[in-house]
Curated annotation (Swiss-Prot):
Membrane topology: Peripheral membrane protein
Disulfide bonds: none
Alphabetic keyword roster: ATP synthesis, Cell inner membrane, Cell membrane, CF(1), Hydrogen ion transport, Ion transport, Membrane, Transport
Self-association and partners: F-type ATPases have 2 components, F(1) - the catalytic core - and F(0) - the membrane proton channel. F(1) has five subunits: alpha(3), beta(3), gamma(1), delta(1), epsilon(1). F(0) has three main subunits: a(1), b(2) and c(10-14). The alpha and beta chains form an alternating ring which encloses part of the gamma chain. F(1) is attached to F(0) by a central stalk formed by the gamma and epsilon chains, while a peripheral stalk is formed by the delta and b chains.
Gene source species: Janthinobacterium sp. (strain Marseille) (Minibacterium massiliensis)
Lineage: superkingdom: Bacteria
Chain's role: F(1)F(0) ATP synthase produces ATP from ADP in the presence of a proton or sodium gradient. F-type ATPases consist of two structural domains, F(1) containing the extramembraneous catalytic core and F(0) containing the membrane proton channel, linked together by a central stalk and a peripheral stalk. During catalysis, ATP synthesis in the catalytic domain of F(1) is coupled via a rotary mechanism of the central stalk subunits to proton translocation. This protein is part of the stalk that links CF(0) to CF(1). It either transmits conformational changes from CF(0) to CF(1) or is implicated in proton conduction.
Localization per record: Cell inner membrane
An annotated Gene Ontology molecular function: proton-transporting ATP synthase activity, rotational mechanism
Pfam families: OSCP
Protein name, as recorded: ATP synthase subunit delta
Cited SUPFAM superfamilies: N-terminal domain of the delta subunit of the F1F0-ATP synthase
Length: 177
């Protein structure tokens, strides 16, 4: 895994420099979409098929994208295909978004809730979490009924677990100690 990160880093940094000079948010959306397409097993098989030309791989990949693809993005995709690095796009996207978050002073927040959150609840929760963590958060919300109640929040390497399940586990540890 560390090897993939090492290989992907220069690509992510170069792409980030290009995106900074243009519209960073539209590039971030395009990079996310490219990563999703590249993660598809059919794309992996196509990219590693020696009978398929680089031009065909590039054009097929570009046609699979819903977002408009500019000249810089086409050049980037062509370069990845020529260097057999197209399947690195998910890791490149991860590093690209980390660079974007660092520039914006933001962080990705993975919020796991026991129940579906309304938009008002989510807005209030994110505002509270932004105060606690001291930076802007980009939330991703999932629902896990196993939490019983409450939420579990992961921001970078920090975890805030206020779920009922976590409280029960703490009580179990305290009672068995």
């Amino acid at each position: 895994m560390a090897e993939l990160a090492t290989i992907a880093r220069p690509y992510a940094e170069a792409l980030f420099r290009v995106a900074k000079a243009a519209d960073l948010n539209s590039w971030a959306n395009l990079v996310s979409e490219m990563a999703q397409v590249a993660a598809n097993p059919d794309v992996y098989a196509l990219a590693h098929n020696p009978k398929v030309s680089d031009d065909l791989i590039s054009s097929t990949f570009i046609s699979a994208l819903k977002s408009p693809v500019g000249a810089e993005a086409k050049n980037f995709i062509n370069m990845l295909v020529q260097n057999d690095r197209l399947t690195l796009l998910p890791e490149i996207a991860t590093q690209f978004h980390a660079l974007k978050n660092a520039q914006e002073g933001a962080a990705d927040a993975e919020i796991v809730s026991a129940f579906e959150l309304s938009s008002a609840q989510l807005t209030e929760l994110v505002a509270t979490l932004e105060k606690k963590f001291g930076r802007k958060l980009n939330p991703t919300v999932t629902v896990d009924g196993a939490l019983i109640g409450g939420v579990r929040v992961v921001v970078g390497d920090e975890v805030l677990d206020t779920s009922v399940r976590a409280k029960l586990q703490q009580m179990q540890v305290a009672l068995t100690a």
